[in-house]
Curated annotation (Swiss-Prot):
Domain CMP/dCMP-type deaminase as annotated: residue spans: 10-134
Enzyme Commission identifier(s): 3.5.4.-, 3.5.4.36
InterPro entries referenced in this protein's UniProt entry, alphabetically: APOBEC/CMP_deaminase_Zn-bd (IPR016192), APOBEC1 (IPR041547), APOBEC_Cyt_Deaminase (IPR050610), CMP_dCMP_dom (IPR002125), Cytidine_deaminase-like (IPR016193)
Gene Ontology terms describing biological process: cytidine to uridine editing; mRNA processing; positive regulation of gene expression via chromosomal CpG island demethylation
Listed GO MF terms: cytidine deaminase activity; RNA binding; zinc ion binding
UniProtKB keywords: Cytoplasm, Hydrolase, Metal-binding, mRNA processing, Nucleus, Zinc
PANTHER family found in the cross-reference section: C-U-EDITING ENZYME APOBEC-1 (PTHR13857:SF26), MRNA EDITING ENZYME (PTHR13857)
Organism, as annotated: Pongo pygmaeus
Cofactor: Zn(2+)
Pfam families to which the protein is assigned, alphabetical: APOBEC4_like
Subunit (UniProt): Homodimer. Interacts with A1CF; form an mRNA editing complex. Interacts with RBM47; form an mRNA editing complex. Found in a complex with CELF2/CUGBP2 and A1CF. Interacts with HNRPAB. Interacts with SYNCRIP.
Name this polypeptide is given: C->U-editing enzyme APOBEC-1
Family of the protein in this entry: Belongs to the cytidine and deoxycytidylate deaminase family.
Amino acid sequence: MTSEKGPSTGDPTLRRRIESWEFDVFYDPRELRKETCLLYEIKWGMSRKIWRSSGKNTTNHVEVNFIKKFTSERRFHSSISCSITWFLSWSPCWECSQAIREFLSQHPGVTLVIYVARLFWHMDQRNRQGLRDLVNSGVTIQIMRASEYYHCWRNFVNYPPGDEAHWPQYPPLWMMLYALELHCIILSLPPCLKISRRWQNHLAFFRLHLQNCHYQTIPPHILLATGLIHPSVTWR
């Protein structure tokens, strides 16, 4: 008989893992929590070793905390490459976007990929412009999908014994809607996704408002992926 196991006790990342309930409340795309959680991976040069850790908001946003920690603990030659992957429960605000760009400009050997569970105050034009500026400066920003949730569950979560495969499987529709809105942001289109908080809890509901400019600019397969658009629509 094989025993059920959680993360190995010999796993050097175990002390940096978050609890399963934390992952669920932070990364559920339907939740509108104020706090932000960051799970991150760092890979140096040609090394195959990946260093993982996590962080949360303090008096500063978690992105700023990461930058301060990274720059204070690491000194490396500009010729050494470093790839960083973030899994954020909220996308960066405009001020954090600016701080990230400054950090990357001072460390040209660093590449950054950001996966986000939700878009932070995406109706705010400053936040939208901040994300566009990040993309234009070479940062990859994507909405977390099922594969990213599973990756985070396995590598960042102190899941219960036997629950490796029982990671939270959130409704794909929310991921697709956020991905659609992220396309609108990157393409400088008006917002199409409106989100409201349900009364007396954190869960949210959405309304989709598409204009002609959305149909004319966004690739049809992205619109159809939401399942809310009829394929007989004339796109262009």
